[in-house]
């Protein structure tokens, strides 16, 4: 999805410095919104995607309104502490959604952005403007750095600070009953100087279903359909393993396996790949685990799959044949392979990371204490849990001892720490 923020190198743009090469696109924006120049002076095209384009602009009437509802500590932190040295112009980001996007999709995004106001770790919507079939969302302008510029240099305490704000934002999103669906470094604006970050881009977000997945997930749903007479297994499970099907039904009454598969390749959870219909905010937590794996292995992106099948095979090489087989059954699917390099059991995280980074410099495993490394691996294991109902929640993950060991504040979530009793006491600090 499209990132709506500029990197540090472009943050010092003045109102008179309109980029020459961006003028045609800015002219199209002004043509689509004839009155936009009355409120905002557009200075730069940040980027454009399939569904939207984003511009940097000066808010002409910033001092005329009460901005306290969206001016978070994130915005304050990126400004000079001396108010007399603060820039005269206050920048915002203008996200223009193309008319080809379904109105219902635009409405959902606006409703979610409005509902999510109030968190320092989630991008707050300032306002929205509509002119005929054109919609413009006004958002805060936040300085950030590219993930590739710092992820290989970060120590465990710095990784902890990064994950703190990411998980805090996800906890807020989850509490509102929303699934982001596209958590990745490109959708988390991180400022390495202030050590703060915000989650952005809710173009794929969805409201979470009321029914959370059971321990047996899709299997329980299929059983319920059979009991209600809405599903009949014409080709029994036991027979399809031993023999090929004798034929195919002309009018098959069985429901097809349809589920939302939106997201970015390499960051989608196994239940998304197996087309589970009971997806929850746990898919966002899985994406956080992939980001942590990128930090620990110095590999980004870590997974380089081209399609869903390749993605499942990549996971199988880490979690083993047995793990993926059980995961598939959980979602009403069958996993079978003849890959000779595939092991039956899951790889040990420490061994995997060590083998990948053995020739790298600034190794986290060598520069951090054994206690911190062990806690990081334990957190990674809880984030990358194949079973969605057993995967740690974002709010619970914030209480993990890893953050305390790295000197990272737990961001105001004062729940009882559920990890103190289950983490091995044999690990020495």
UniProtKB/Swiss-Prot annotation:
Major enzyme class:
transferase
Keywords of this entry: ATP-binding, Cell cycle, Cell division, Kinase, Meiosis, Nucleotide-binding, Nucleus, Phosphoprotein, Serine/threonine-protein kinase, Sporulation, Transferase
In which compartments does the protein localize? Nucleus
Binding of ATP, residues: 46-54, 95
Known EC number? 2.7.11.1
- What Pfam families is this protein classified in? Pkinase
Q: Which GO CC terms are listed, alphabetically?
A: cytoplasm; cytosol; nucleus
**Any one biological process term the GO annotation gives:** signal transduction
Q: Which reaction does it catalyse?
A: L-seryl-[protein] + ATP = O-phospho-L-seryl-[protein] + ADP + H(+); L-threonyl-[protein] + ATP = O-phospho-L-threonyl-[protein] + ADP + H(+)
Which residues are recorded with the post-translational modification Phosphothreonine?
A: 264
Q: Locate the coiled-coil region(s) and give their ranges.
A: none
Q: Tell me where in this chain the Protein kinase domain is found.
A: 40-402
Checking SUPFAM superfamilies in the record gives: Protein kinase-like (PK-like)
Give this protein's Gene Ontology molecular function annotations. ATP binding; protein serine kinase activity; protein serine/threonine kinase activity
Q: Which residues form the active site?
A: 182 (proton acceptor)
Assembly mode: Interacts with spo6.
Give the record's family classification.
Belongs to the protein kinase superfamily. Ser/Thr protein kinase family. CDC7 subfamily.
Q: Which PANTHER family match?
A: CDC7 KINASE, ISOFORM A-RELATED, OVARIAN-SPECIFIC SERINE/THREONINE-PROTEIN KINASE LOK-RELATED
What does the function comment of this entry state?
A: Required for the initiation of meiosis II and progression through anaphase II.
- Protein name, please? Cell cycle protein kinase spo4
Q: Which organism is it from?
A: Schizosaccharomyces pombe (strain 972 / ATCC 24843)
> According to the entry, what is the taxonomic lineage of the organism?
Eukaryota, Fungi, Dikarya, Ascomycota, Taphrinomycotina
